[in-house]
């Protein structure tokens, strides 16, 4: 009986740890609308607040596209991103690319380079090719 209780406790702790590590996308309609119009609205905790400030400050040249927003929308979305941002080196990226963060590299280290250039995947930024809507927290 003791053995069963210990196993249940260990299993429960592992399940709780797995749930705590899952990414979720907080609900913000404007963020989903604006960021989701070109790509999936990436969960805010994937970058640090500093990264989000840099990214939002350069929307006129957002990875080769002009993604400029109105001042009000930009301010509201930035506030949302800062409030829900990740923290620490794990989520920081000098290039502002999510795929350059230590978190992304750790989570995707088993995927070989051939998979990233698969026509159905296209690039590391196409999360929904493998994860579907799960990345959105849906």
Provide a role label for each language-model segment.
Residues 9-18:
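Hydrophobic h-region of N-terminal signal peptides that target proteins for export
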């Amino acid at each position: 009986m003791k053995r069963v209780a210990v196993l249940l406790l260990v299993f429960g702790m592992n399940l709780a740890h797995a749930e705590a590590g899952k990414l979720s996308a907080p609900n913000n309609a404007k963020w989903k609308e604006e960021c989701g119009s070109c790509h999936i609205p990436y969960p805010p905790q994937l970058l640090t607040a500093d990264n989000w400030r840099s990214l939002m400050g350069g929307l006129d040249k957002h990875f080769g596209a002009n993604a400029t927003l109105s001042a009000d929308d930009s301010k509201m979305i930035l506030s949302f991103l800062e409030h829900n941002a990740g923290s620490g080196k794990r989520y920081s990226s000098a290039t502002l690319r999510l795929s350059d963060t230590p978190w992304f590299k750790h989570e995707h280290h088993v995927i070989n380079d051939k998979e990233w250039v698969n026509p159905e995947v296209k690039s590391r930024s196409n999360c929904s090719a493998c994860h579907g809507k799960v990345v959105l927290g849906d």
